[in-house]
């Protein structure tokens, strides 16, 4: 039972303890002490009527007791001890609305723009999702000491810079929500299409990102929050078909669509419709709408490429970037033929954009291959190979290279 409560409520308890104690490390210590007490007492005394409230209360009072002991040796801690004692009897600290808002406070604090992006991701996975330092390091192919240092520095920055533990004001909320969504999507993207390593995907990361997306949807019912969750669900729906049994990369057009998860597609498509109907949607919703068009096509040949190009046109105006241009060019190639797409990709590369982006060169190689321009295709595949760090992608590109005529 304690294990079940830990899985379901430990992050909520931690979020409230951070608010009450004002420090990440003290809150984590209090959380550990509270669950240690639960393991000792619940089998003997029975499970409390409200386990979460019991854990928060126990953790807080253990922290207060520890602080009182420290005051004997460090007088500078007396003010903190007095404040904690006074707050302990404040009913506003315990009302349900405050406790529910604590999860939002934690997310916004972990994703504060004053923190470096890699620290935002590491802190969010550690504090909001509860992953260990070793799990985060393994997911991002980084050493545990590196991840630990990022987390330590992020906590120090929050403490020393006086970053408030709060939900942003209404005026600041749109920009801050964008930062949170960006962090969640970074986590998902690394799980959906790993930037390096032996696997195409990392289910642990994409699963955590979807869990975060669902949590945000509960706490912050905004159209773009729904749009991001829809995008993640629709992309995740194809996971089983994205690699062969041998672990080889399978392109979208060659995937066995019977392996796609129809429940995730239905949920994602419904979220897209809800976000679009709000008229307040943004880039994540538009990307999700594109993913929904792919998901709803019964076969690759039945894909509505005209609709996809139209959606990319809207996305390019809402959130212009070279990557959006590249994806639009690939869709134009499917609608109007490879030469039309190649012309657009060459224009992007001629500007100097995406010169070190392996997918730009692999897309160019594929269009040259389809046009029978083997020498250009070979050079572009070779360039893409030099830039990719993911083993299945490397094997795919090597296979395509070997299939080109001499």
Language-model features: locations:
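"A position-specific structural signal for the A-helix of alpha-solenoid helical repeats
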Residues: 228, 232-235, 287, 291, ...
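Arg/Lys-rich amphipathic alpha helix in sigma70-family domain 2
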Residues: 60-78
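Amphipathic alpha-helical interface segments
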Residues: 15-16, 20, 30-41, 54-66, ...
């Amino acid at each position: 039972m304690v294990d079940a409560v830990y899985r379901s409520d430990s992050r909520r308890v931690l979020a409230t303890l951070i608010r009450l104690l004002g420090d990440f490390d003290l809150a984590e210590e209090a959380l550990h002490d509270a669950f240690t007490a639960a393991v000792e007492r619940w089998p003997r005394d029975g499970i409390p009527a409200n386990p979460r409230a019991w854990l928060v209360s126990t953790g807080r009072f253990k922290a207060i007791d520890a602080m009182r002991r420290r005051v004997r040796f460090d007088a500078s801690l007396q003010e903190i001890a007095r404040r904690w004692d006074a707050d302990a009897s404040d009913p506003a600290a315990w009302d349900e609305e405050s406790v529910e808002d604590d999860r939002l406070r934690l997310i916004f604090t972990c994703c504060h723009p004053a923190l470096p992006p890699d620290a935002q991701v590491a802190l969010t996975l550690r504090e909001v999702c509860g992953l260990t330092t070793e799990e985060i390091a393994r997911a991002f192919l980084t050493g545990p000491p590196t991840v630990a240092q990022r987390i330590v520095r992020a906590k120090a920055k929050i403490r020393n810079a006086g970053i408030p533990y709060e939900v942003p004001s209404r005026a600041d909320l749109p920009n801050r929500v964008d930062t949170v969504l960006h962090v969640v999507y970074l986590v998902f993207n690394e799980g959906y299409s790993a930037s390096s390593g032996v696997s195409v995907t990392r289910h642990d990361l994409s699963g955590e990102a979807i869990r975060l997306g669902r949590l945000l949807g509960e706490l912050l019912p905004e159209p773009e929050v729904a749009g991001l969750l829809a995008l993640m669900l629709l992309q995740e729906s194809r996971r089983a078909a994205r690699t062969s049994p041998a672990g080889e990369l399978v392109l979208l057009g060659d995937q066995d669509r019977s392996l796609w998860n129809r429940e995730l597609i239905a949920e994602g498509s419904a979220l897209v419709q809800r976000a679009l109907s709000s008229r307040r949607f943004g880039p994540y919703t538009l990307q999700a709408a594109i993913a929904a068009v792919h998901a709803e096509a019964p076969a690759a040949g039945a894909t509505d490429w005209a609709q996809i190009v139209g959606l990319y046109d809207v996305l390019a105006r809402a959130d212009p970037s070279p990557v959006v241009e590249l994806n639009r060019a690939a869709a134009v190639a499917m609608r109007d033929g490879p030469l039309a797409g190649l012309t657009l990709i060459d224009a992007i590369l001629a500007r100097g954009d995406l010169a070190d982006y392996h997918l730009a060169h692999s897309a160019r190689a594929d269009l040259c291959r389809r046009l029978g321009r083997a020498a250009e295709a070979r050079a572009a595949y070779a360039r893409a190979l030099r830039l990719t760090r993911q083993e299945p992608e490397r094997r795919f590109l090597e296979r395509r290279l070997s299939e080109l005529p001499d």
